[in-house]
Amino acid sequence: TANNYLDPKKHATKFIAVRYGNVLGSSGSVVPKFIEQIKNKKKITITDKQMTRFSITMNEALDFILKSAEYGQGSEIFVPKIRAYTISDIKNSLTEILADYGEEEIGIRPGEKLHETLINSEEIRYSWEYQDVYMITNPLYPMFNPTIIDETYPGIKKLDKFEQYSSDLVDKIQKNELKKIIEESDLLKTK
């Protein structure tokens, strides 16, 4: 496992990870699916109107990966400070831009969650806020004691403002802003 590589004296390779939710418009995501349904003059299929998801654009995701590689010392998980959207706002944004052929609520599929969690309640104990990211540290890694963390990451703060980082608890991207993001992207171009 990765824990076998924790001792920097034995292994020079540093592993870090990123978590960032849904990349807006990526393959298999809801926006291209909804656009296709509208272009085919079909009802939009919605699992649950209250469903929320974190959202990041492709450029934001790429910038975040590079920033995480720059910040990382080894074994951290980096999570961006991002907002979320409701599935209803995505649907309403697209129907206002394109057309409205109705909707059909199909229910949540087995294993699907109503809200997305990027830092769970267990991980919060080992999580920090650093500049514009959250950082989950590995409690087994010797360099992640509070003194060394303070020295390595100037201005870092223990993350204690919520019990978990979940898409239902963060600020939402409003419909007008979603429309602007969608219109400025390449998502509406015919393939």
Question: Residue ranges of each PLM-predicted region?
Answer:
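Strand-loop microenvironment adjacent to phosphate/nucleotide-handling motifs in alpha/beta enzyme folds
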Residues: N3-K191
